[in-house]
């Protein structure tokens, strides 16, 4: 299980009151896909009763992204503190652990200074940002957001515990994403921005997630 180290993030000039989330990415063991789906559905029902906002996605590799959202880190802490004393959760967790349906492949603790609209299709571009360059990179993201939303995307920005940025775009359907991609490729404003941003890059694209809401 991947260990997570939480660090407070300073977002510079683009900092606003941010929602927070923890995203756990689960990979089903062979032949256990249906059991994993059943488990996350049951976990969601319990966690929502405990006060979390839960969203589920399946990615292009058939991993499940189990996202718990909170108004702030204080609310997250209260949720975490309540888990050991929640009988329903403890009984479920023991049963699910013994069943061994999946492995936790990654965990991200995120702040969202800007949130994308909740829609059936989400694209997430994960950027490894150079140390100390997160505010500068977020400023670039704000500029690209204007272009992408003009072309039909809803854009969000998520900053993880290592100050890396996950740039999110959501759409009504995969067809809508395809139409967006065609328009983007032909957009002169985007081409000019993209060329300028890559002249002195401050981040490296390390992962692209194609997510469908469950």
Stretch-by-stretch model annotation:
Residues 1-2, 206:
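Generic cytosolic/nucleocytoplasmic N-terminal low-complexity/intrinsically disordered segments
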Residues 3-16:
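Sec-dependent N-terminal signal peptides
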């Amino acid at each position: 299980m991947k260990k997570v180290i939480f660090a407070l993030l300073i977002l510079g000039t683009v900092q606003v009151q941010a929602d927070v989330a923890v995203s756990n990415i689960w990979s089903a063991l062979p032949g256990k896909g249906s059991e994993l789906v059943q488990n996350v559905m049951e976990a969601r029902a319990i966690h929502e009763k405990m006060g979390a906002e839960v969203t589920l996605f399946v990615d292009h590799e058939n991993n499940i992204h189990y996202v718990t959202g909170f108004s702030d880190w204080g609310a997250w802490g209260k949720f975490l503190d309540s888990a050991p004393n929640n009988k329903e959760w403890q009984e479920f967790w023991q049963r699910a652990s013994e069943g061994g349906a999946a492995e936790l492949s990654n965990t991200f603790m995120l702040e969202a200074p800007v949130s994308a609209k909740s829609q059936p299709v989400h694209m997430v571009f994960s950027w490894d940002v150079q140390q100390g360059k997160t505010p500068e990179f977020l400023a670039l993201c704000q500029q690209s957001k204007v272009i992408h939303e003009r072309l039909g995307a809803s854009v969000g920005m998520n900053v993880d515990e290592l100050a890396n940025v996950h740039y999110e775009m959501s759409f009504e359907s995969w067809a809508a994403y395809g139409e967006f991609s065609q328009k983007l490729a032909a957009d002169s404003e985007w081409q000019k921005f993209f060329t300028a941003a890559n002249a002195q890059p401050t981040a490296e694209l390390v992962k692209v997630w194609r997510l469908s809401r469950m």
